[in-house]
Amino acid sequence: MHAHNAATLTLRSLLNCVAREFPDHVRWLETQGHLRFMLTFPEGGGSLGLPAHYRSATGHHLFGEPVMLTDENGAKTVDAVEAISAVIERLEPSIAAKDGRVDLLNRTHSSRLLIEAALHARNGDLAALAGDEVSFVAAEQGLIAGHGIHPCPKSREGMTEAESRRYSPEFAAGFPLRWFAVESELFHTGHSQGSPSAEEWLKEAMGSDIDALKAPLPAGDFSLLPVHPWQADQMLKDPTVAALVAAGRMIDCGEAGKPWFPTSSVRTLYRPDASFMLKMSLGVGITNSVRVNLARELLRGDDMYRFRRHELWQDFSRSYPGLTLIPDPAFMGVKIDGALIDGLSVSMRENPFTGANADRNVSLLAAVCEHLPDRGSRLGALIRNRAHLERRPLDIVARDWFERFLTIFVRPIFGLYLRHGIAMEAHQQNIVVEIEHGYPIGLFYRDNQGFFHHERAHGALVEALPGFGEPSESVFGEEPVDERLLYYAFINSVLGMVGALGREGLVSETALLAMLRRELLRLEALEGANSGIVRKMLAPTLQCKANLKTRLARMDELVGPLETQSVYLQITNPLFETEKVLAHA
């Protein structure tokens, strides 16, 4: 059962990519009240067809069985694993794409096997993960299938199966940190004014374990650096690190302390009794990139921390309550000859979910929306339960839920951009939503790496906050910043929420899109005098990241200029289509 469900989920996310990125090869056929998805391969590669249980205007479709593959050998029924291979091998058949196909086949295979193992390991938890009350760490470790429009959302390129089980959140993992003593001349650290230093935070969390680690060290001035255990093993093979260890300038102290728990990003680690989280460097290929903290990204935590303390944010929050920023105000790493050693840098994030708040009913948005076979989504369960308790129709409760989501997400996220030019890559894994009595009441944004602003806004921001965004290289042209905000916050999170509500059968997407359109026009009237972002959200097409094409091109979305990190393309905008429907109603 778990193998079948994992293959079904993998095929679904792959076909969602295909429908979005290769629309000229896709047809939706309706016969006798049944909808069918048909994919025609180029260069006489045949076709693949299967039932479509739900077609979403936002791209979050649901598919059924059987799957039929037709080519020169005739038509035959294939299972989901065979269908995945056929799609990858036949969709881009050119010689130039061969390496990309091989890489994608391997990653998709890896992702599917991890989902299968996670479904098996967490089978007894799946119902509770869709319950009314879910803690931060439970939700973080309960995102089983991941990104619904990505060909390999759970690949862990570089990790063995045993390592994945030990270090991945899907297996409810927890493990102690690996520690290195670093000669203080090499140790590089910083923190925002007003924030605890990295050393202060570590001492608070580790207590006597710090003293035990330092006791056997040789005479000299050393600082302690926590490293992800998997990353530590890899870095010891690095010639620069190996030389420092051989010279006694870095000392491997082994694992020590209480277990830390990986969150949905795999590399960010949480402890319910610590006042901070650790965003580790992790040289593992996850979705579209290897997750290593870059020097400029360490400084973006200071940008967010300073902005959050400033009157600009305080005044904005009074106008748009509901959004909390979670900065990473401290960092540490190893610096030699003036350059950070990639792979050893650690960013330290404030932890609002500690102590009495560890059991707070909060969840990353992706886990709320995730639809699993035989279970559906937590979103659907919450709304069905509220409709039952309130004795109101499902569609009315779903609209109320979405209205509250518009208030706490769309207004502050896009309002901040319209007023101050600050964009956040607020996709569904970077947003944590707080639930009370079944409804969303507040949001937390994390991930300083995706916190930047455009050049036109820079003058006013730097006047209020000298140097803002400059050392962190967080100032970009308005066009690429618009593009990132449109994809991560609008397409991924907002339209993703529309699709999640629609595919649960709770309410029509057309009704939700009409609500969204009204909200965007209202926001534009209030804040949008100097920006065209709302017009772009209402345009006939949207600039959208193409995860399948990005993977076929073997691009790393965290490497290179912002403008060239991923493949982007134009997709049909469901909001524009809704406007046409309403205009002719």
Swiss-Prot record:
Metabolic or biological pathway, per its Swiss-Prot or TrEMBL entry: Siderophore biosynthesis; rhizobactin biosynthesis
Pfam families xrefs: FhuF, IucA_IucC
Gene designation: rhbC
GO aspect biological process, one term: siderophore biosynthetic process
Gene3D superfamilies (alphabetical): 1.10.510.40, 6.10.250.3370
Protein's name according to its UniProt entry: Rhizobactin siderophore biosynthesis protein RhbC
Family: Belongs to the IucA/IucC family.
GO molecular function, a single term: acid-amino acid ligase activity
InterPro entries in alphabetical order: Aerobactin_biosyn_IucA/IucC_N, IucA/IucC-like_C, LucA/IucC-like
Keywords: Plasmid
